[in-house]
């Protein structure tokens, strides 16, 4: 079916519907349009259905607009009947969820030439009355009774058509019948909206003539066209650069007086509920504001437009014995914008007071202007004194206005003017308070910036083996601490090395990670040890930091009391991953705590802070092997994290309870050899 839009010739305000139709056509494109598929509604499978979320997403991606703008445009499309809802027909809005919608057939589009007549609506209501067995909405019952009285002469035809359409509809299958019912209901909801719903098609009366129709050229029309072009040739032409310069100058001059661009002093009364702005800028206030007085110096029209400015200018003219000029101009304005019934009376008074020979306030105008004015007063009208008013206006503008700006009257007024200070209402949550407005960035630019940022993040590969990466402390992270008893020779994988079955504690109870100066990262310790400048039996970082050394905090034991031969310096990173796996900690879930205030415990739980939660029982000191710790002993009183390495040959002795040193799992064999 072709789309007929001849009805738009008489409805210029509905011309935007053609743009909506073009967008709806793009939506129905099988390749680039909205995804449509069969959906089951109640007991019927409706074909070519779509969800509101898919429509909103398509509009956002197709037009490159924000979600709010796409939602507004989608609501317009639904309200004008191009898309109708299946599940909630009365609610003509686009829901951004899984609600089902269908495209309206072009026959029911608003741009069709045929109008929504009362006969068609009566047939629709009669058919619904037969189908629902008299159960209609209240407004539908009222319209049914009203149409029965209005077109009673052809009501038999209405009932006959309704019965025939109802019988034809029963012969269709369920899906087609359900879709056609939804289409008709959506059409009449748009064209016969129920009470309380906004009628979007209410545009007023149609034009009598077609504005797009080509008119026949007549002699009178051609003469008017010739006269128009002759007058256009007589006008003075100005270069575009001069005109643009004048516009820029005017904008710069009046920018400080623009309440929208620069705000208003002392405050905006519509925002702060403070009427001081209106009080200071009253028409005839005793002392005006400084900004108001400065505006009088912009041009003569600004002065004569302001009642307070006219009052001051009148006082100046009286001192120069020319006050009748401004009085005549005000009388002409009263005649021009006053009551029509008093035009003749006011014109006679003005003539006797200002223009008649020997008048009390006679004005000085040239003889030609006087003759034109006197002839026009024979048949007075609103604009009969325009020639004399223009003459007096130009006289005051070119002569009196310049002297007024240099007079002591204006200077004294400017000196006494009030300059109010900006006041804001603290309880107001509105952000508009004398601030320069900036236009929002385009959604297209924002989306391009987001895509570029994502591309840069994807291109940056993370190498955790490089020094300096991931070594900064993260105060918001909490690392799980577990324990692992050293395995026995008979059982290399101890049961205590299995992962705990209980879930982690609440993140709010985790202890924050300390500063790197107190307990450095094991990666940094390994990297510092790889330099080969420090023996393995010494703590290289204990002397540089303010914290106590490892040897001071470690309790004496039988193993450490025996003197052991010192091994040559060896890098910490020299231990390979295979050695770590052979020592039996493959299944260990233990992670380093890296906190000097929360030691590891043997039960594999996270130690709470302070009095939070249930206090765990204190266990006896026990030697454990931690993931990142080389040698560790459970302290009883001190909470200092033990991060040190002893002689590697200590693990080769006969004592099975001696700790075994491990390395970070990400350190490769090549790095160990290089150290």
Curated annotation (Swiss-Prot):
Organism placement in taxonomy: Eukaryota, Metazoa, Chordata, Craniata, Vertebrata
Tissue and organ expression note: Isoform 1 is expressed in photoreceptor outer segments. Isoform 2 is expressed in brain striatum.
Role summary: Inhibits signal transduction by increasing the GTPase activity of G protein alpha subunits thereby driving them into their inactive GDP-bound form. Binds to GNAT1. Involved in phototransduction; key element in the recovery phase of visual transduction.
Domain DEP: 30-105
Ranges where the RGS domain occurs: 299-414
Subunit text: Heterodimer with GNB5. Interacts with RGS7BP, leading to regulate the subcellular location of the heterodimer formed with GNB5. Component of the RGS9-1-Gbeta5 complex composed of RGS9 (RGS9-1), Gbeta5 (GNB5) and RGS9BP. Interacts with PDE6G and GNAT1.
One term under GO cellular component: rod photoreceptor outer segment
Keywords carried by this UniProt record: Membrane, Phosphoprotein, Sensory transduction, Signal transduction inhibitor, Vision
The protein's name in its UniProt record: Regulator of G-protein signaling 9
Source organism of the structure: Mus musculus (Mouse)
Residue numbers spanned by region Disordered: 524-571, 637-662
GO biological process: dark adaptation; G protein-coupled dopamine receptor signaling pathway; G protein-coupled receptor signaling pathway; intracellular signal transduction; light adaption; negative regulation of signal transduction; nervous system development; regulation of calcium ion export across plasma membrane
Gene of this entry: Rgs9
Biased composition (Basic and acidic residues): 552-562, 646-662
Domain G protein gamma: 222-283
PANTHER family attached to this UniProt entry: LP21163P, REGULATOR OF G-PROTEIN SIGNALING 9
Post-translational modification (record): Retinal isoform 1 is light-dependent phosphorylated at 'Ser-475'. Phosphorylation is decreased by light exposition. Interaction with RGS9BP is decreased when isoform 1 is phosphorylated at 'Ser-475'.
Alphabetized CDD domains for the sequence: DEP_RGS7-like (cd04450), GGL (cd00068), RGS_RGS9 (cd08739)
UniProt-recorded Gene Ontology molecular function terms: GTPase activator activity
Polar residues: compositionally biased ranges: 542-551
């Amino acid at each position: 079916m072709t789309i007929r839009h001849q009805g738009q010739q008489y409805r210029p305000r509905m011309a935007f519907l053609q743009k909506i139709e073009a967008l709806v056509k793009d939506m129905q494109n099988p390749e680039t349009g909205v995804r449509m598929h069969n959906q089951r509604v109640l007991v019927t499978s409706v074909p070519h259905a779509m969800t509101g979320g898919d429509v909103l997403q398509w509009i956002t991606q197709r037009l490159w607009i924000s979600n709010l703008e796409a939602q507004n445009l989608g609501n317009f499309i639904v309200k004008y009947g191009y898309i109708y809802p299946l599940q909630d027909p009365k609610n003509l809005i686009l829901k951004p969820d899984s609600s089902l919608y269908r495209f309206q057939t072009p026959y029911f589009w608003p741009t069709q030439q045929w109008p929504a007549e009362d006969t068609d609506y009566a047939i629709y209501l009669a058919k619904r009355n037969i189908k629902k067995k008299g159960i209609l909405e209240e407004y539908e019952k009222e319209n049914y009774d009203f149409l029965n009285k209005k077109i009673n002469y052809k009501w038999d035809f209405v009932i006959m058509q309704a019965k025939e359409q109802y019988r034809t509809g029963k012969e269709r299958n369920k899906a087609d019948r359900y879709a056609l019912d939804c289409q008709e209901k959506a059409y009449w909801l748009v064209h016969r909206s129920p009470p309380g719903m906004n009628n979007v098609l209410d545009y007023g009366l149609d034009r009598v003539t077609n504005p797009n129709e080509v008119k026949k050229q007549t002699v009178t029309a051609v003469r008017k066209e010739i006269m128009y072009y002759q007058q256009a040739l007589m006008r003075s032409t100005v270069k575009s650069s001069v005109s643009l310069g004048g516009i820029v100058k005017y904008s710069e001059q009046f920018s400080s007086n623009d309440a929208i661009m620069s705000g208003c002093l002392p405050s905006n009364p519509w925002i702060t509920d403070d009427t001081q702005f209106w009080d200071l800028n009253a028409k005839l206030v005793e002392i005006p504001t400084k900004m108001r007085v400065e505006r009088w110096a912009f041009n003569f029209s600004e002065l004569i437009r302001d009642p307070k400015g006219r009052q001051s200018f009148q006082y100046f003219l009286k001192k120069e014995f020319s006050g009748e000029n401004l009085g005549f101009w005000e009388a002409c304005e009263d005649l021009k914008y006053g009551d029509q019934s008093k035009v003749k009376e006011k014109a006679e008074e003005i003539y006797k007071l200002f223009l008649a020979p020997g008048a009390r306030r006679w004005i000085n105008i040239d003889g030609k202007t006087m003759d034109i004015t006197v002839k026009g007063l024979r048949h007075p009208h609103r604009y009969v004194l325009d020639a004399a008013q223009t003459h007096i206006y130009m006289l005051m503008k070119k002569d009196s206005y310049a002297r007024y700006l240099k007079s002591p009257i204006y200077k004294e007024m400017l000196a006494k003017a009030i300059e109010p200070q900006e006041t804001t209402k603290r309880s107001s949550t509105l952000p508009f308070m004398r601030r320069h407005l900036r236009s929002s960035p385009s959604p297209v630019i924002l989306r391009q910036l987001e895509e570029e940022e994502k591309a840069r993040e994807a291109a940056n590969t993370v190498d955790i083996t490089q020094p300096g990466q991931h070594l900064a402390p993260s105060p918001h992270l909490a690392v799980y601490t577990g324990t692992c008893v050293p395995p026995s020779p008979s059982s290399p994988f101890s049961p205590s090395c299995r992962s705990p079955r209980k879930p982690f504690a609440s993140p709010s109870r985790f202890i924050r990670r300390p500063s790197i100066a107190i307990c450095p990262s094991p990666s940094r310790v390994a990297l510092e040890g790889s330099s080969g400048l420090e023996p393995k039996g010494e703590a290289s970082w204990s002397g540089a930091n303010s914290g106590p050394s490892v040897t001071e905090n470690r309790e004496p034991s039988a193993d450490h009391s025996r003197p052991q031969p010192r091994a040559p310096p060896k890098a910490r990173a020299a231990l390979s991953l295979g050695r770590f796996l052979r020592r039996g900690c493959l299944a260990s879930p233990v992670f380093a705590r890296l906190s000097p205030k929360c030691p590891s415990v043997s039960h594999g739980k996270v130690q709470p802070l302070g009095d939070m939660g249930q206090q765990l029982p204190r266990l006896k000191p026990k030697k454990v092997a931690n993931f990142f710790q080389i040698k560790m002993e459970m302290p009883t009183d001190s909470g200092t994290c033990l991060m040190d390495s002893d002689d590697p040959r200590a693990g080769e002795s006969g004592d099975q309870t001696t700790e075994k040193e491990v390395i970070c799992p990400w350190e490769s064999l090549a790095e160990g050899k290089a150290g």
